[in-house]
């Protein structure tokens, strides 16, 4: 499929021992810094536009920096920011670099709290000012806040309006910046609450500061900040006084995992990243429950706190299908199951002609689903072999057994992705021609005019890569029939929780449904849906439903599949083509624990998702449909 820009990646490390401990045990006080690099590099798939990191020292004296940040843009941003950090040590002697106490006193990024972020923009905004972590500075250590996250908020406009109505003047219109300011404001109030409490105890001067830093309660800050936001999020932060937290949204949309022992407390967006980095078992890693936060206090005390009640069980199923690393044990099993469940629909598509069918996949994320599909075909073939042997009225001869058992699953790597070529694809008139060569084929792998070619992908979103590249190169091998298979169901609805697909007209499934309604002369249904969406948008957001679902009630899955083939078939391609999508029931059977399926069903877990989907249809009608055909 065409690559999607999607949710970001986060990494946090809290060292629970002094730096000298790591110097003695691991030979370097940079243990935390090195582990942060690994956590970020292992999650490079989650963000290739920019990266950033921040660090807090617990033991500093006035006049010395205790909070550090480094950020960079580009696909090599991780390497760049860590190279910059290392440059800060370049003038130090080997003796100083091996001295943890010296590093603690004198070197930047020699701290106990580390936080990293990998960015994929879902808003189209670029520039270093939009790269996490964000930083809010103050002369009081406890009021300093560094914030990063994997999130996209659906109600940022409402929050912005509320802030401006109160007389505030935010400098930047973005969910990240507004969250920083809102949370920073609540952190200020929490510090001031402790200031008053310290004065009431008769404390003065630095004793007040010590009291504040010992008693500031980050859970209070989160409880007064996060209920304002609607969306999918994992929000991570560190304060200048040494508090660390990571909170997951109450719907469980975005993922977060943590691990703790007596040396470290760590958080990452994916389970296998923690397993690999710290050489631990799957069961050692815990999932952060929806609506809870992992909080590590200045003194190293770690706890899980309930910040908001869980509102739904809506963890993202698309995360399992496409975004997360397939090395996660449960994700690997789920992707195999998705592929295996497509066996029967594909058998029908090839008219059960397994002898003249080649199975393959589109690199690279569909590989695991392909293994599942192969397993399903092997099981079917074994059943056929047994039935054929049992049907004989005599003990089979060696020749008969050889003939029966020779009909096996045929599989080949037909498509190859030229990764280097993609980096040179230019904009403009030459783009489509260059894009058509991003994939290549294995020559002589298909018998022209005789073999069916089944090729599985993880999902089909826009259909651009199919149209511009894949169908053309597969057609050059002249198969009898091409069956393109999606391990995911039809993607019908936009996402507003961190994945870059917010417009309905981008989806080939939606475009096909609209074309079918036009052909059926059902313009009235399109107009009715538009009117219903507009009426829905006038309701309180909590009462809104998804009116866009009406569009799909008048067309069948098979009709949409055939229309997509018609729309995406490149000029000159003559080979018969058929699409096979995963069913919604198959999705739920393969991934039963992750019920967030709004991409496929329109069942948005949050009110803001419902509102934005209705607004997306209104935008489509007014900006696209009305230009093509008036009501």
Describe each model-derived feature in a short phrase.
Residues 342, 359, 459-460, 482:
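Hydrophobic, well-ordered secondary-structure elements that form the walls
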Residues 94-101, 195-216, 379-408, 520-529, ...:
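Short mixed-charge
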Residues 440-452:
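Short basic/glycine-enriched coil/helix segment immediately N-terminal to the Walker B
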Residues 1-289, 295-358, 362-363, 372:
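Conserved short alpha-helical segments that host acidic/polar catalytic motifs at enzyme active sites
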């Amino acid at each position: 499929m065409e690559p999607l820009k999607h949710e970001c990646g986060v990494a946090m490390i809290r060292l629970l021992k002094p730096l000298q401990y790591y110097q003695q045990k691991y030979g370097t006080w940079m243990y935390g810094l090195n582990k942060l690099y690994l956590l970020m590099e292992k999650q490079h798939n989650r963000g290739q536009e920019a990266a950033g990191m921040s660090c807090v020292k617990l033991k500093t004296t006035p006049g010395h920096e205790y909070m550090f940040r480094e950020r960079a843009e580009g696909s090599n941003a991780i390497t760049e920011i860590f190279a910059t950090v290392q440059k800060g040590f370049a003038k130090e002697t080997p003796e100083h670099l091996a001295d943890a106490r010296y590093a603690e006193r004198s070197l930047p990024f020699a701290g106990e709290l580390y936080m990293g972020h990998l960015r994929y923009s879902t808003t189209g905004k670029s520039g270093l000012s939009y790269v996490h972590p964000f930083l809010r500075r103050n002369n009081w250590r406890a009021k300093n806040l560094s914030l990063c996250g994997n999130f996209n908020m659906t109600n940022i406009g409402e929050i912005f309006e509320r802030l401006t109505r109160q007389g505030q003047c935010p400098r930047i219109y973005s969910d990240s910046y507004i969250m920083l300011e809102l949370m920073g404001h609540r952190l200020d109030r929490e510090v001031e609450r402790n200031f008053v409490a310290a004065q009431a105890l008769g404390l003065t001067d630095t004793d007040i500061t010590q009291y504040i830093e010992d008693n500031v309660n980050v859970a209070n800050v989160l409880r007064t900040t996060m209920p304002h936001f609607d969306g999918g999020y994992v929000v991570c932060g560190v304060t200048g006084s040494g508090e660390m937290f990571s909170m997951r949204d109450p719907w469980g949309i975005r993922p977060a995992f943590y691990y703790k022992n007596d040396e470290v407390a760590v958080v990452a967006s994916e389970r296998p990243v923690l397993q690999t980095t710290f050489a631990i078992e799957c069961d050692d890693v815990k999932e952060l429950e929806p609506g809870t936060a992992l909080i590590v206090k200045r003194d190293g005390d770690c706890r899980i706190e309930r910040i908001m009640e869980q509102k739904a069980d809506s963890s993202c199923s698309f995360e399992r299908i496409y975004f997360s690393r397939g090395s996660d044990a449960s994700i690997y099993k789920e992707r195999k199951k998705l592929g295996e469940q497509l066996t029967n629909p594909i058998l029908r598509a090839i008219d059960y002609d397994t002898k003249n069918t080649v199975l393959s996949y589109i690199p690279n994320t569909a590989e695991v689903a392909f293994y599942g599909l192969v397993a399903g075909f092997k099981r079917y073939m074994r059943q056929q072999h047994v039935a054929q042997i049992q049907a004989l009225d005599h003990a089979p001869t060696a020749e008969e057994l050889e003939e029966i058992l020779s009909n096996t699953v045929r599989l080949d790597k037909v498509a190859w992705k030229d990764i280097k070529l993609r980096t040179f694809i230019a904009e403009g008139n030459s783009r489509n021609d260059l894009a058509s060569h991003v994939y290549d084929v294995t020559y002589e792998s298909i018998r022209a005019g005789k073999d069916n070619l089944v090729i599985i992908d993880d999902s089909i979103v826009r259909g651009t890569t199919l149209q511009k590249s894949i169908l053309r190169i597969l057609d050059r091998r002249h198969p009898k029939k091409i069956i393109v298979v999606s391990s995911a169901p039809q993607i019908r609805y936009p996402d507003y929780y961190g994945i870059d697909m917010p417009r309905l007209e981008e989806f080939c499934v939606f475009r096909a449904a609209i074309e079918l309604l036009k052909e059926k002369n059902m313009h009235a249904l399109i107009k009715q849906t538009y009117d219903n969406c507009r009426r829905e948008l006038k309701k309180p957001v909590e009462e809104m439903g998804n009116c866009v679902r009406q569009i799909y009630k008048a067309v069948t899955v098979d009709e949409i599949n055939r229309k997509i083939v018609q729309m995406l078939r490149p000029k000159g391609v003559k080979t018969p083509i058929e699409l096979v999508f995963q069913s919604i029931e198959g999705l739920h059977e393969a991934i039963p624990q992750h019920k967030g399926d709004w991409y496929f069903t329109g069942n948005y877990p949050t009110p803001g998702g419902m509102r934005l989907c209705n607004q997306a249809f209104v935008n489509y009608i007014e900006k696209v449909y009305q230009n093509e055909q008036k009501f």
